[in-house]
Curated annotation (Swiss-Prot):
Interacts with RPA2. (Microbial infection) Interacts with influenza virus PA, PB1 and PB2,leading to inhibition of RdRp complex assembly. Antiviral interferon-stimulated protein that plays a role in innate immunity and in the suppression of viruses through different mechanisms. Plays a role in the late phase response of TLR-induced immune effector expression. During influenza infection, interacts with PB2, PB1, and PA to disrupt the formation of the viral RdRp complex. Inhibits zika virus by interacting with the capsid protein in the nucleolus and reducing its abundance through proteasomal degradation. Strong transcriptional coactivator. It comes from the Eukaryota. The gene is SERTAD3. One of its GO terms (cellular component) is nucleus. This is SERTA domain-containing protein 3. It is found in: Nucleus. It holds the Pfam family SERTA. Residues 1-21, 104-125 are annotated as: Disordered. Disulfide bonds: none annotated.
């Protein structure tokens, strides 16, 4: 079993402090997450056998982000790139590395060797957003991807909901019967509590 790398709590706090949770920062975070999820879906539709759990997670994330983008007021999109600050770039790089680690831990394969940007080079202009991402904002993109086809193959007819039954109560003579060890221990604990 492949183990994951643990991050220190202080590293997580520093990253959270750098994130901007204003409406614009939150929207850029959601857009970065949506772009990464779409990339993962497109890569996973390749020649290897897809993992159902992975597709369910990605599909649910995409649906939540799409619903959030529909509910949010649509601001006029400037012709400038979506990622303007180094915080957005480092956030998307962090999310991308986490998802790659998740892939390797689930698949058991070696991660692709992508060069990690050193801290000194983060001041450079981040890459332009993919046109695929802008296309993903339209509601028909997710409908064309065929993600729902994965769930049609699941046979749920054998799974019937049974009425919830109360768990059977154990016989009272087995637990805390007078004279048993547990009963004496409980009496002793109560004497200590009441005596203090």
């Amino acid at each position: 079993m492949v183990g994951g790398l643990k991050r220190k709590h202080s590293d997580l706090e520093e990253e959270e402090e750098r994130w901007e949770w204003s409406p614009a920062g939150l929207q850029s975070y959601q857009q970065a997450l949506l772009r990464i999820s779409l990339d993962k879906v497109q890569r996973s539709l390749g020649p290897r056998a897809p993992s159902l759990r992975r597709h369910v997670l990605i599909h649910n994330t995409l649906q939540q982000l799409q619903a959030a983008l529909r509910l949010a007021p649509a601001p006029a999109l400037p012709p400038e790139p979506l990622f303007l600050g180094e915080e957005d770039f480092s956030l998307s790089a962090t999310i991308g590395s986490i998802l790659r680690e998740l892939d390797t831990s689930m698949d058991g394969t070696e991660p692709p060797q992508n060069p990690v940007t050193p801290l000194g080079l983060q001041n450079e202009v981040p890459p332009q957003p993919d046109p695929v991402f802008l296309e993903a904002l339209s509601s028909r993109y997710l409908g064309d991807s065929g993600l729902d086809d994965f769930f049609l193959d699941i046979d749920t007819s054998a799974v019937e909901k049974e009425p919830a039954r109360a768990p059977p109560e154990p016989p009272h003579n087995l637990f805390c019967a007078p004279g048993s060890w547990e009963w004496n221990e409980l009496d002793h604990i109560m004497e200590i509590i009441l005596g203090s």
